[in-house]
């Protein structure tokens, strides 16, 4: 989980209060002409409209079953694998729903980029979310049980036969310090969703293995209603630097007022010929004018890495985007960072969708 200091949280809270106060003092006419007034609603609706959807399958819980998704991914469920949240064994008809994210475009639409919680880049063989229900009752897997998954896949970039499994974390922990009703110093930890979409944490006891007999990558999922993926850490021996992406235009200032929810302005980097996606979600603080934008994790971007950037924004219900190829260059002079500037121009919603999908072939 990514931790925020109380100072950062205070800045966020103060900004949110300031924006709220300003809105209350503005007239309706002024609010409708403010290009940054939608607070991410346009981008949120856009992403939700094109996000990967669940596929549902009906199985016999007592007998066990297997089914194959539209992507050719096979799921096998042992007999008697389900139980209620109260621990009662389940038989009869059960609905199993799966959501699969296997491409950079789906990573954007589903807000599931491939980076670890500490900023390392992952080469993805797929991200998976599975849930099961009987009627209106949510089910879980029995202790020490698992469903088996087989993904059509071949090793990429010299990966060996063993690929780590990862658990998805879409929250950040905020640490708040203050005083309680008895004037005693206290520290609280609060969790909330964040802009990064998800951070991946390795499950040290779980791996996926290539099956040369049928050309699949095989692994187990031992928990429902949680994101799992089978990704290899990208090995790059190059010196790392910090990257800053500047927006020369159409940066929605409300991107900087709240650490939670959807960002009306966003920036992605797709390394060439790798099934991975980097989302730069940390905003540049104290930025003005053309210095507004996003910053990578500190010293996390390999110098010389080539890829395609996609800068996107929404203002006043309109879409803006720019796609450009770029290289993570070495810092100039005494700088400890490298930069690239973007100038998103107005596009249609269809154009925005097509730009995102085109990342799959980069």
What are these regions (language model features)?
Residues 23-26:
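Bacterial signal peptide processing site
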